[in-house]
């Protein structure tokens, strides 16, 4: 039994079984030589573990392993793959080496177009990824860049495209990497003086998929090598699919020539899902798990959890885990009881003061400007946007929103909401502002 298993056994004896099942059992452990990395499915579990259990985990680890360094991360533990099938090595950020990555084995075949839930927020991204999979290398979508906040489905679409390419052509060399893996592989090649081999290995793929290219910012040599890799693949009509947490031109430290290359193909924003899409996602994920979730429970989660798909999944995991443990049916009352802290945290994260500050900062204003009685266009439009965002992202009533904006009447708030919705249909810049603000508030 390893140090983490022994620590977990002790924690099970010290804490209520229900708490252990909800907060500690979902953790995936990666025990290193002198540290432990715990992967959690969502940020809420990370916060709970950090606040309630981390100090005790460190004490137990020091006792059983002789060290107490513990790192909490969101995601899944890296899965080992067979080194003999690999074209090159890609060490992770935490260890000096990692099993090599094969062309086929590093695509997660769970993520397909069939189980991707389509909505207004991701419709264009889905269509673009599907076209890239159908016609890889076509200049209309090469490179394909999917950008947006965390947990919105960018990686799902990337995997779906890669899996579709391999389904159509089982011999296709489709390589998926996180950006830090590209960086680590390059560093190793530099150290071992095997850069020529490094370049050949990347340039022989049929499709290159790289996640989170914002990680390249400020890394000049990495950007240079990726720039040359990009050019070789593009000239060879090999498909490139990338993701970024924002539009690349907004990433400081990314070279102008690389930003220019990324604009050659198709860039698509993936936005936070709307209510209907969120509800559909909850129901779809529940079906995948074989769980029976009433529609009203899905609607409750969708109404309260507005930020991203990952948080929706986290809420669903917490709900189903407690239901399985207690044997209770999943009802609205059970969901409200189980998710009370999670829902409260969501409400606190997106508050009226937070919205006002975010909008004011975005437009280069002071909060007092948004609350003032002045009606100049430079103030009136941001004020309307702030009120509309508050209606969209919080549970506050129109009168409450009006009160928060210097005592304005509820009809003023209603007019602002309708006005912004109407204007966004025709004003692309306003729509872009709205989407960017949604992303900022959902991070």
Swiss-Prot record:
One of its GO terms (cellular component) is cytoplasm. ATP binds at residues 151, 153-155. GO terms for biological process: DNA replication initiation; regulation of DNA replication. Keywords: ATP-binding, Cytoplasm, DNA replication, DNA-binding, Lipid-binding, Nucleotide-binding. It is found in: Cytoplasm. Residues 67-105 are annotated as: Domain II. InterPro entries: AAA+_ATPase, Chromosome_initiator_DnaA, Chromosome_initiator_DnaA-like, Chromosome_initiator_DnaA_CS, DnaA_C, DnaA_dom, DnaA_N_dom, DnaA_N_sf. Residues 106-323 are annotated as: Domain III, AAA+ region. Belongs to the DnaA family. Domain I is involved in oligomerization and binding regulators, domain II is flexibile and of varying length in different bacteria, domain III forms the AAA+ region, while domain IV binds dsDNA. HAMAP family: DnaA_bact. Plays an essential role in the initiation and regulation of chromosomal replication. ATP-DnaA binds to the origin of replication (oriC) to initiate formation of the DNA replication initiation complex once per cell cycle. Binds the DnaA box (a 9 base pair repeat at the origin) and separates the double-stranded (ds)DNA. Forms a right-handed helical filament on oriC DNA; dsDNA binds to the exterior of the filament while single-stranded (ss)DNA is stabiized in the filament's interior. This is Chromosomal replication initiator protein DnaA. It comes from Stenotrophomonas maltophilia (strain R551-3).
